[in-house]
Every structure is written in C-alpha cells, then in structure tokens.
C-alpha cells in the first residue's frame, strides 16, 4: 500500500531536525518531503535520510509550488503569517499541524476551519513546546492513585539550543503582548502588570520569579 509523504515545512531548522529524528524512530519507512525556500538546505537534510525528498516551497502560490503531487499531511514548524500551508491542506482535505502561533493568533486559523469543518483534521499544537511538558506530566501522573494538583514551570535559558525561527517566535510573543491568559477559580482572564509575572520552583530547588517582560505565552 502506497503512503503519501508528510510535508515538513521548516524541516531544515533545529526543530525540524528533532522532529525528523522522532518520526524516524517511530516510523522508519515513512516518506517525507522536506520543504524549504532554499533547495540547498533541504537537500543537505535529505542527503542523510532514506525515504525523503527535498522540495522548494513557494509560500505565495496556492499549491505551494508543489503542483498536483500527492501529500498525506502537512506540518509547519515556523510561524506561517500567510496561513499558506493551512489553506493548502484545507483545500485538499489533508491533516495540518501548526506549532508556532500564540493563543492570541489562532482566530484566523479557526475561521478557515469553521468554513468547512469536515474537510480535514486541523491540530493547533500551540501549548508549551507543543505539549512536551503536558504529555510528560500526564504520563507521570498515571503512577499515582490520586492527584490533588499539577503545577508546571518551564524556563528557557538564553543558551538553550534553537534556530532563528525559535528566536523569532519568542521575540514576537514578547513584543505583541504583555498580558497572560490564566484560569482562576474556573474562569479565564488576562493577567496584566505585576499580576502577569510568574514564579515557580525549579528542579534545583531554587525559586524563580519572572516579571511579565521575561515570560512568553
């Protein structure tokens, strides 16, 4: 049975590297298309992979420059301001995963899906690190008969590895909002000013207090 490839947009960056590694461990024969505006970068990635092909993406074209070639799913690993990848996937009825929008940026994407909700699956992977902390916490919680509360704190060090797209995302989040969407006593509300700061206890037992200007959504 032939399987259409997954199109990875942003597959040449740091996040793309880890994504490909994870996919290969789980699905070693899964065909991949590594999409980039730079063919040389895409070919550099695919030269080290089996069942992978480099493709040049045109974000201004309705078909992303791919023509009629079959695609099984689309994953975009950077901020797609034009929503070109989502429109492409939605028009063809194939699943789409995006990971780089903030909670305040999802309305245009949801609006596209609402126009034809049964066209395809759309995953809004915008929770912290695409759910890495959430999934790990829920997995650990299964060992307990009862859980009274869960508190997750995540601190990104300025020396943590990440490509330019990651840096761009954090700078965008910090520049466009100074408030935090929080849930208190069952109600969601925007915390502003001093209330937007956050404190948590790190694994080395130190207490961290971060002002609003130093945190990301």
Report the location of each language-model feature.
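Canonical Rossmann dinucleotide-binding motif of NAD(H)/NADP(H)-dependent dehydrogenases/reductases
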Residues: 4-26
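A structural signal for isolated positions on well-ordered beta-strands in alpha/beta enzyme cores
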Residues: 7, 31-33, 53, 151
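Active-site-lining helix/loop region of Rossmann-like oxidoreductase modules
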Residues: 9-10, 14-17, 142-217
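Conserved glycine-rich Rossmann-like NAD(P)H-binding loop of the short-chain dehydrogenase/reductase
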Residues: 28-39
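NAD(P)H-binding glycine-rich loop region in Rossmannoid oxidoreductase-like domains
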Residues: 40-108
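General beta-strand structural signal in soluble alpha/beta enzymes
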Residues: 98, 122-124, 152
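Rossmann-fold NAD(P)-binding glycine/threonine-rich loop
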Residues: 100-122
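Short alpha-helices
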Residues: 123-142
